[in-house]
């Protein structure tokens, strides 16, 4: 895997995880 591709995948995963965490936090709390 290319380093640039890995970077984009990491950014996309972090972005999706942060959104999921915020939504889960609002629904949970």
Swiss-Prot record:
GO terms for molecular function: electron transporter, transferring electrons within cytochrome b6/f complex of photosystem II activity. InterPro entries: Cytochr_b6-f_cplx_su8_sf, Cytochrome_b6-f_cplx_su8. It comes from the Bacteria. The chain crosses the membrane at residues 3-23. Keywords: Electron transport, Membrane, Photosynthesis, Thylakoid, Transmembrane, Transmembrane helix, Transport. The keyword Transmembrane applies. GO terms for cellular component: cytochrome b6f complex; plasma membrane-derived thylakoid membrane. It is a single-pass membrane protein. One of its GO terms (biological process) is photosynthesis. It is found in: Cellular thylakoid membrane. The 4 large subunits of the cytochrome b6-f complex are cytochrome b6, subunit IV (17 kDa polypeptide, PetD), cytochrome f and the Rieske protein, while the 4 small subunits are PetG, PetL, PetM and PetN. The complex functions as a dimer. Belongs to the PetN family. Component of the cytochrome b6-f complex, which mediates electron transfer between photosystem II (PSII) and photosystem I (PSI), cyclic electron flow around PSI, and state transitions. This is Cytochrome b6-f complex subunit 8.
């Amino acid at each position: 895997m290319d380093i640039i591709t890995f970077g984009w995948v990491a950014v996309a995963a972090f972005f999706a995880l942060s959104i999921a965490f915020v939504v889960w936090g609002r629904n949970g709390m």
